[in-house]
């Protein structure tokens, strides 16, 4: 019996080794991995196992060359080759990398899925284990805050559009009794863009109401407040420090449209303004969660506001909305945004190119025409950030041998 148990453990280890190495040399990772791409140029694609075992996730599995070679010999993917002396490995020349064309990029986007609802303390291995029977996953990106805290959501790339669609279309998927929000990546971004557009429309409408209200003092505000009675839901409890407004949108996504959330991260209570009656949204959400409506796995007290408490809260929300609108106006609204993002270079070019009459724009300026280099197009725009290419399935930056990592230990991540 003990021998059977050992054999099962070894088989599981070998499967993990194959999966990890085949990820390193796979279609998704290899084109993005600068270090590994440099290594395969040195010796006809061969990479020494001595180098490979310095990759952190493989190192945690094994450093034994024989175990690695034995594992790869049992792989059914036929992606990797082992050298005759069993000291080097390479991606099989018969399996060339796909050409990274626009068509290929679109194909990757079409089989990328957004999944939200994981606890913030979940690890990459936890998520990989949960996804094991959901289809073949080529890459997992754990989405993080600016402070590197896991946000509880991921982007996963499936091996085919069919497997991605099958996963997205499967209803009622949960992670440890927590309902998950699952969308195609493109649908997720479309949803976020629609929310931004809706916010702009609401801001314009609010501005119009305020303008009309100045001619009829109190009438517009009174009608607006009366129309929102019964739409406020107060929540309180020992909330997670990472709780954010998006969590409430997720919780009530199919039960009621949220118009405003009076809440700041780190607070223990707040108020949600629904478009329709808050009681209906609360009952629907409770029913969908078997009567136990948790927020990031924390117990929460939910209360529909009435009477003076409701009027006071509505007045505060109205004032906050007006303040937000005023700030937006003070920045110039659309005019201010014309100088942000993709068009910011137009102002800068005034000082970089030739001045009037072919003269330099300023003293000491280089002669010649200042040329805009174009917007940078990223293949993987999940985080919408610039910086080193990430090794997504590790949830870290690309791995390099420990010797190189030691040269930059001032705040660098664990490799």
From Swiss-Prot:
Claim: Glycosyltransferase is one of the keywords in the record: no
Q: Which GO terms describe its cellular component?
A: cytoplasm; cytoplasmic stress granule; cytosol; nucleus; ribonucleoprotein complex
Q: Tell me the residues on which N6-acetyllysine occurs.
A: 116, 128, 327, 356
Compositional bias (Basic residues) spans?
Answer: 328-341
What sequence ranges are listed for the domain xRRM? 226-343
Q: Which molecular function terms from Gene Ontology are attached?
A: mRNA binding; poly(U) RNA binding; RNA binding; sequence-specific mRNA binding; tRNA binding
Return the protein name. Answer: Lupus La protein homolog
Q: Which organism is it from?
A: Rattus norvegicus
The upper taxonomy is: Eukaryota, Metazoa, Chordata, Craniata, Vertebrata
């Amino acid at each position: 019996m003990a021998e059977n148990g050992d054999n099962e453990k070894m088989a599981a280890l070998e499967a993990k080794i194959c999966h990890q190495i085949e990820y390193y040399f796979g279609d998704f990772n290899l084109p993005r991995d600068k270090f590994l791409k440099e290594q395969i140029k040195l010796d006809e694609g061969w990479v020494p196992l001595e180098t490979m075992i310095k990759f952190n996730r493989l190192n945690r599995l094994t450093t034994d060359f024989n175990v690695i070679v034995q594992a790869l010999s049992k792989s059914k993917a036929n992606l990797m080759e082992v050298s005759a002396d069993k000291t080097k490995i390479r991606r099989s020349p018969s399996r060339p990398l796909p050409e990274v064309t626009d068509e290929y990029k679109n194909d990757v986007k079409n089989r990328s899925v957004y999944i939200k609802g994981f606890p913030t303390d979940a690890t990459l291995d936890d998520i990989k284990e949960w996804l094991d029977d959901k289809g073949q996953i080529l890459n997992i990106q754990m989405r993080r805050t600016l402070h590197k805290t896991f946000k509880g959501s991921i982007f996963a790339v499936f091996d085919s559009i069919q497997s991605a669609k099958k996963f997205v279309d499967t209803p009622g998927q949960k992670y440890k009794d927590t309902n998950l929000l699952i969308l195609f990546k493109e649908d997720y971004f479309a949803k976020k863009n629609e929310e931004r557009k809706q916010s702009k429309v609401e801001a314009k409408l609010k501005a119009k109401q305020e303008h009309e209200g100045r001619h009829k003092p109190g009438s517009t505000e009174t009608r607006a407040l009366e129309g929102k009675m019964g739409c406020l839901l107060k929540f309180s409890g020992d909330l997670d420090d990472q709780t954010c407004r998006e969590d409430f949108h997720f919780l009530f996504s199919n039960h009621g449209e949220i118009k405003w959330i009076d809440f700041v991260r780190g607070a223990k209570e707040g108020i949600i303004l629904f478009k329709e009656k808050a009681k209906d949204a609360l009952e629907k959400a409770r029913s969908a969660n078997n009567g136990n409506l948790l927020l990031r796995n924390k117990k929460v007290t939910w209360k529909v506001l009435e009477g003076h408490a409701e009027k006071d809260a509505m007045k505060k929300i109205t004032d906050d909305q007006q303040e937000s609108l005023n700030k937006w106006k003070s920045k110039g609204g659309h005019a201010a945004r014309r100088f942000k993002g993709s068009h910011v270079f137009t102002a800068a070019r005034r000082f970089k190119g030739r001045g009037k009459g072919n003269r330099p724009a300023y003293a000491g300026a280089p002669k010649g025409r200042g040329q805009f280099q174009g917007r940078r197009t990223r293949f993987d725009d999940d985080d919408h950030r610039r910086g080193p290419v990430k090794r997504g399935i590790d949830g870290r930056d690309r791995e390099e041998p420990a010797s190189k990592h030691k040269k930059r230990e001032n705040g660098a991540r664990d490799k």
